Amino acid sequence: MFPQEEKLIRERLGREPNDVERAMLEVMWSEHVSYKSSRKWLKLLPTKNEHVVLGPGEDAGIIKFDDKTWIVIGIESHNHPSAVEPYGGAATGVGGIVRDILCMGARPIALLDPIRFGPLEKEKNRYLFEYVVKGISDYGNRIGVPTVGGETEFDESLDNYTLVNVACVGIMKPEHLVHSYVTEPGLKLIIVGNRTGRDGIHGVTFASEELSENAEEEDRSAVQIPDPFTEKLLIEATLEAVYTGKVRALKDLGGGGLTCAASEMVGKRGFGAIIYADKVLLREPGMTPLEVMISESQERMLFAVRPEDVEELARIFEKYELEWSVVGEVIEEPKFIVYWKGSKVAELPIDLLTEVPTIEWPMKEYKIEEEVGIPRISLQEAFEKVWRSPNIVAKRWIWEQYDHEVQGRTVVKPGFDSAVLKINEEYGIAITADGNPNHCYLNPYHGAMGLVAEVVRNLVSVGAKPLALVDNLNFASPERPEVYWSFAETVKGLADAAKAFNLAYVSGNVSFYNEIVDKPIKPTPVVAGVGKVKLSKIPKGPNKGDVVTLVGETKRELGGSELYRVLGIRKGIAPRVNLEVERKNAESILRLINASLVSFVHDLSRGGLLVALAEVAALFNVGMEVTIKTDMNPVEFAFSESHGRYLVVLPERKLEEAREITDLKVIGRIIGSNSFSVKINDEVLLWNLDKLKDVYWNTLYRLMD
């Protein structure tokens, strides 16, 4: 807390808070819990459309899939913990977002993991990468929730640090909805799951400040300990309890522990709570009430239940061999009172915990965009560098550690523009996640707009109609004027783009203070999207003889591109989005797919056209012959990251009909031979298909050996 906040608290209370109260207030007034620096700006985001059942404000958002099925989605970051202890930090990040989905009354069915690291040439970055992936893999596999997609990026600005964002999707019936807040007094508050220990104490305050050079030693105790086996039992027990209709409210004990879960649960509708902290089951001897109230031990849920229903639910918990205890009750008076062995150890007005004043930090606009000349490099040399980039090559080294088919719903697997999960015999959902800190660093507003556009392109490329979005905003300290300005610009860009597509943000997360030893990260918003797809219409893949076509205009837009990154060029102008064109092209692609006119569609984004072509060849083991005439420099045309573009592969006999829907420029053909050949004006790129595939599929393995 800042000195002026402490002064405000003393004035409200008319006294100094005691140690327990101070610890609880520090948790609730932390940036991580209160969103005090971001709340004002987040109000700009659209949160309603015809698909939204429940927008931001609870643990996850809910979208209507059909009359019998709702989709639940949320996203969280676990950046600081993963930078300090990558295995435990990443694993508990998975556990936390899964419980957020669970406490709405939904079964978690899939995970996405947008993760970012420093360059793999450094041993520390390889260590963070290896153990973050292992943490996500072990936890997800053991609880039986598949990790079906995400994205992985390596950038110099993240040296010795990591950004670990995890999104989770769940499925539920409308009648099973449980809210995270109570609507009546007299309810009993029950903690179910793991015993409470000293792990994760001050976790949210540690996540609300920059990391020091010695963070690995100093902050390890703030990282929670993962226990996926208990989580698996907790999922089944919680759902069985929810299906009885006897659960009045439900919260995950995550950041801020019991203090946060209980105060938010009762405070939303103006109720209060009495907590008997000595009734909490402990894992370690000698714990104090302060430690009990702010511990962030994992795999714990807080149930609000009428007194007459406690016994019935307890039988369910015991059936799954989960420990439980009644730790408090909901009261009419808006106070949060804590007892320890008969003595009152804390008493605070509930709104002092839950209604934290906003902060508006000073802002300073920065302008770093400037025109950069076209690099003097051949098409062959440029492709050699970009195609070998860890940001471009296949992430199979990661997927192979994940069980992405558990639960049997996965229709389109990792490695494509979106993953697709079967919901019923006819329809499924497509899910995807995207970030682009290089574009957002050059221009936060246009970079953020481009991000939403890319999510839409990824969804429609598999035939899905976009329904809703969630956002995870990773930034450095808001106390830096340039950072706070870039945050506000990012939110404006996310809002304007979503409105253009009539999309709403149903949930989200803000993670500030992502910097280590005074080195701030680039603005890194991540957007995940969900869409509805008819399973029979998903494009299956290219066939020999198909024509390769391009939809959308390629412009002179290399700023923030992967080509510039591998060449060490940090300047440039970020690509601009024409929202009208983007929307029109997305609608056209959906029409092409629904009319069964195409074999395959791939969005153009990182790496540009040449990378998209090579990805199709490598993914499907097909030869390709491409010839392009342009008034642009061949390297610029090949690696521009202009928005609004798609590769569309289709049988030649369907070309005429497809052109009635949209303008398709034929640039090449799928061939039977073992070659990947691209000619742009007079420059020729020729690769053997086996070599192309070897680089794509095996580079990450070689880097991690």
Curated annotation (Swiss-Prot):
Main localisation: cytoplasm
Binding site for ATP: 35, 471, 508
Matches recorded under InterPro entries: PRibForGlyAmidine_synth_PurL, PurL_linker, PurM-like_C_dom, PurM-like_C_sf, PurM-like_N, PurM-like_N_sf
Catalytic activity reported: N(2)-formyl-N(1)-(5-phospho-beta-D-ribosyl)glycinamide + L-glutamine + ATP + H2O = 2-formamido-N(1)-(5-O-phospho-beta-D-ribosyl)acetamidine + L-glutamate + ADP + phosphate + H(+)
Active-site residue list: 32, 78
GO molecular function: ATP binding; magnesium ion binding; phosphoribosylformylglycinamidine synthase activity
Pathway linked to the protein: Purine metabolism; IMP biosynthesis via de novo pathway; 5-amino-1-(5-phospho-D-ribosyl)imidazole from N(2)-formyl-N(1)-(5-phospho-D-ribosyl)glycinamide: step 1/2
GO BP, sorted A to Z: 'de novo' IMP biosynthetic process
Protein EC: 6.3.5.3
Gene Ontology CC annotation, any one: cytoplasm
Location in the cell: Cytoplasm
CDD domains named among the record's database cross-references: PurL_repeat1, PurL_repeat2
Residues that, per the record, bind Mg(2+) 1: 76, 509
Binding, Mg(2+) 2: 100, 252
Membership in a protein family: Belongs to the FGAMS family.
Subunit structure: Monomer. Part of the FGAM synthase complex composed of 1 PurL, 1 PurQ and 2 PurS subunits.
Function: Part of the phosphoribosylformylglycinamidine synthase complex involved in the purines biosynthetic pathway. Catalyzes the ATP-dependent conversion of formylglycinamide ribonucleotide (FGAR) and glutamine to yield formylglycinamidine ribonucleotide (FGAM) and glutamate. The FGAM synthase complex is composed of three subunits. PurQ produces an ammonia molecule by converting glutamine to glutamate. PurL transfers the ammonia molecule to FGAR to form FGAM in an ATP-dependent manner.
The name this protein goes by in its record: Phosphoribosylformylglycinamidine synthase subunit PurL
Species per Swiss-Prot/TrEMBL record: Pyrococcus horikoshii (strain ATCC 700860 / DSM 12428 / JCM 9974 / NBRC 100139 / OT-3)
